[in-house]
């Protein structure tokens, strides 16, 4: 694939405990699907989605990593080349939230110091089973200087907003020459292209 096919290429890696819905978020955004009974990711997988933002083609290489401890050494190797990390937890699972500091330590150890990190609370369609309040998560994200968003991969709530706002932020950072545009990774078949005319606040 030549550089003429896109203006920007960014690598986004989803991390977090097993079962929080990382694969479902990726498939909802890239394929418009919610896979019922989705099994745990084995190792690492990735998909491609091309979006158009303010007339520029942005290719997002979205990596879905396994959350199980036995795959941790594999997934850690993908941190370094990531432009952005989406740290995901399940709002109905207290344990997945309490593990966030451990994931942040891994980010600090293995990721670039210029990586953009976003905190996502998934499964808001199960609000009646919520174990982690939105206020608590917002306070945690503010303390860690992370953008926070709640999503539902099942209902598609805020999923597109998550990735497109992140793409806007990545473009802004790239223009300031604070990110390396990683174009060395192989690209599989593309997902659908969509347009996004304006960038939302993503600070």
Curated annotation (Swiss-Prot):
Domain of life, per lineage: Eukaryota
As for subcellular location, the record says: Membrane; Golgi apparatus, trans-Golgi network membrane; Golgi apparatus, cis-Golgi network membrane; Golgi apparatus membrane
Q: Which organism is it from?
A: Homo sapiens (Human)
Q: What is known of its domains?
A: Switch I, switch II and the interswitch regions are characteristic of Rab GTPases and mediate the interactions with Rab downstream effectors. The switch regions undergo conformational changes upon nucleotide binding which drive interaction with specific sets of effector proteins, with most effectors only binding to GTP-bound Rab.
Q: Which gene encodes it?
A: RAB30
- Catalytic function, reaction form: GTP + H2O = GDP + phosphate + H(+)
**Where are the bilayer-spanning segments?**
none
Q: Which cofactor does it need?
A: Mg(2+)
Gene Ontology biological process terms in this record? Golgi organization; Rab protein signal transduction; vesicle-mediated transport
This one is known as Ras-related protein Rab-30
Q: Which GO terms describe its cellular component?
A: cis-Golgi network; Golgi cisterna; Golgi membrane; Golgi stack; intracellular membrane-bounded organelle; trans-Golgi network
């Amino acid at each position: 694939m030549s550089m003429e096919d896109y203006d920007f290429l960014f690598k986004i890696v989803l991390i977090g405990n097993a079962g929080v819905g990382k694969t479902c978020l990726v498939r909802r955004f890239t394929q418009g699907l919610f896979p019922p009974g989705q099994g745990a990711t084995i190792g690492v997988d990735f998909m491609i989605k091309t979006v158009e933002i303010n007339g520029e083609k942005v290719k997002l290489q979205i990596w879905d990593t396994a959350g199980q401890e036995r795959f941790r050494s594999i997934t850690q190797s993908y941190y370094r080349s990531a432009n952005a990390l989406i740290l995901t937890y399940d709002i109905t699972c207290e344990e997945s939230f309490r593990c966030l500091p451990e994931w942040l330590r891994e980010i600090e150890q293995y990721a670039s110091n210029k990586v953009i990190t976003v905190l996502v609370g998934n499964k808001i369609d199960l609000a009646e089973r919520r174990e982690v309040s939105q206020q608590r998560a917002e306070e945690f994200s503010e303390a860690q200087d992370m953008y926070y968003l709640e999503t539902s991969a099942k209902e598609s709530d805020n999923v597109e907003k998550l990735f497109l706002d992140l793409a806007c932020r990545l473009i802004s950072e790239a223009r300031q020459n604070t990110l390396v545009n990683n174009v060395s990774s192989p690209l599989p078949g593309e997902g659908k292209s969509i347009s996004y005319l304006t960038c939302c606040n993503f600070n």
